Amino acid sequence: DCGYTSTRDIFADSWEKQCRLPLFPLFHLSDLWCRILYGWSFAKASPLDAVHRCRLPMLFIHGDKDSVVPVEMVHRLYEAKIGDKELWILSGVDHGAAYLHDPQIYAQRVRTFVEHWFECPAILEQ
């Protein structure tokens, strides 16, 4: 739900469009700071690569009015996914609000996906 393609992409979108801050040098300085303090790089945080490598069935959910993660990103994630996948774009829904938009439909859609692709009776009985 609300998946983004890469740290760089989400920084570029939020900093340049919402905050009016340049991606360079802020992204590179932030990346350097994380490497020094935490020992990891933003380049290693790539949902796009992770989705491409994952062989499990995947359900992509996104609101078409997402103000934080552009809906175009879920289309790129969906295209990167090899194998079984499903894309659900909710009309008029903002960031993180897919469940709140209609909890019953959301739960049913996720349940249907899980029942179709996975065998997990303990979860499905609840």
Where are these regions (language model features)?
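Hydrolase active-site cap/lid region
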Residues: 1-43, 49
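Catalytic metal-binding/acid-base residues of hydrolase active sites
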Residues: 4, 65-66, 94
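Short, well-ordered secondary-structure micro-motifs
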Residues: 9-12, 71-72, 100
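Conserved alpha/beta-hydrolase "acid-adjacent" motif
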Residues: 43, 67-73, 98
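Short alpha-helix in the alpha/beta-hydrolase fold that links the catalytic acid
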Residues: 47, 56, 70-79
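Short beta-strand/loop motif that positions the catalytic acidic residue
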Residues: 53-55, 59-62, 66
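Catalytic histidine neighborhood in serine/cysteine hydrolases
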Residues: 75-98, 103, 109
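Catalytic active-site module of serine/aspartate enzymes centered on a nucleophile-bearing elbow/loop
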Residues: 100-126
